[in-house]
Amino acid sequence: ENLLAVPVIMGIKTRSETFAGAEYTYTIEGFIPEANKGIQCATSHHLGQSFTKMFDIKYNDENMQISHCYYNSWGFTTRSIGVMIQTHSDDQGLVIPPKVAPIHIVIIPIYTKNKDRVCKFCLDLQKELSLKYVVKVDFTENRPGYKYNYWELRGVPLRIEIGEKEIDNKMYTIVRRDTGEKIKISD
């Protein structure tokens, strides 16, 4: 819920749905509001001591008494990623929540001349932002519109557009991937 920004429903499975051999099973169901459906994303099975007694697995407790271990089994599945994609993505591609995004910010240099000046500024900004975020500067020779689309498709949470005009005016455009909102900020 906190990492993938997906609504979840947590609970205990019914006896008939409990993992074979388990005393009880907890579940986390990812909820997809648009589809009004839940998909199992994670489970935790409390297996008690049945398996450890069967295989004679023991340990010394804090009083140095020999006891059988309690055992559990759990899993967080790749279905969780599917729920995140279905919940957040749109017609432009992925929308990845910042806490799990492999790249948090992409900087797009825009220039017709003074390429070196713009690129140096972008590198300096990347260095500063990289203290807290994972930042990429797109130095490909593609046009800005192509770059915008490329990174939107991949779900990078924030895009910063930097050109000569922005450097001169000390005003920069930040674009949020989740809402498409363009925010002007000053240096």
List where the protein language model places each region.
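NTP/phosphate- and nucleic-acid-binding module
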Residues: E1-D187
